[in-house]
Amino acid sequence: MIKIISGIQSTGSLHIGNYLGSISKNINLQNKYQLNLFVANLHTITVDFDPTQARQNIIELVKIYLASGFDTNKNNIFLQSEINEHAALGHVLLCHTTMGELERMTQYKDKKQKFVQSNQTIKIPTGLLTYPTLMAADILLYQSDYVCVGDDQKQHLELTRDIAIRMNKRYGELFKVPEPIIAKVGSRIMDLNDPSKKMSKSSLSKKGIINLDDSREEVLSKIKSAKTDNLNKVNFDYKTQPEISNLVSIYYGAINDHFNLGLKSAKFNKALDEEVVPIDIIKHFENKSYKDFKEELFELIWNILDNIQTNMKKITDEDVMRVLKSGKDKLLPIAQKTLLKVYQKLGMVI
């Protein structure tokens, strides 16, 4: 079976951008492929974090995946830090990467500006620079066919492929070179009140974020107050109508979510496995107002959140521990086999 690897950081307080941009897409893939999903808690510590919340954040993240419909009978979820081969292979890959390659990463360039000191020096955590090689290890360790990443991780995946090709050429076949799965629409959900900024829990305005644990009233209020323009015409063009285009992107992700299959069929007369695309949404709301659009958007978003919140109440911490152990037990032998092969090719085994 074709295998996909995907990771998500356990930073707490997940929002609809996290869900539609990553979780929902992973859930939709799991019936066609074997999905190996890891909680990327080693990546979480590359920047400032709260160790007192780390364990609970992991538990909550796994609960959300299970509540969202992650099928552990066919797929695996595991904790990155429990498989030491991630860090070990990460070091090997780091030794086959140049400083120039790492410093060219756009995310590194953007994030390092946050560490400018009062005297204009920059105090950058080393983990921020070396993040891409650990990510490369996460991917290459399991010989996956595809990797599901967000648009903002595309450059990191290109570096991963470069490293794999480089090492395969030098040492012989070590790694399968993975192909990306990157959604063209909906992989990057923007703030409801500022479509120039990615939806983030660190946003100054909480009205721009729909959290997965928001109440019905909170979701309704946030969608009603979401910024639009004065054209009152549903369209999908980020250059001319960025506000409504962002909401259409959210609608697109929500209508194609597995929790909304019934609503998709009723509203668009689509087969269960047939995707609603932005042009369908524009036609659906032709001659309708933004008010009509927001009412339907609320219906879709709340149906997702209501299902997740209801399912979450049934999942215990013990369920999480059992699922993580099962995932580790299945993935550890694969990781060990890959790392041993690398060590042997590099002459590191006596």
From Swiss-Prot:
Cellular localisation: Cytoplasm
InterPro entries tied to this protein: aa-tRNA-synth_Ic, Rossmann-like_a/b/a_fold, Trp-tRNA-ligase, Trp-tRNA-ligase_bac-type, Trp-tRNA_synthetase
Binding site for ATP: 9-11, 17-18, 150-152, 189, 198-202
Locus of motif 'HIGH' region: 10-18
GO molecular function: ATP binding; tryptophan-tRNA ligase activity
Self-association and partners: Homodimer.
Name of the protein described by the UniProt record: Tryptophan--tRNA ligase
Native source species: Mycoplasmoides gallisepticum (strain R(low / passage 15 / clone 2))
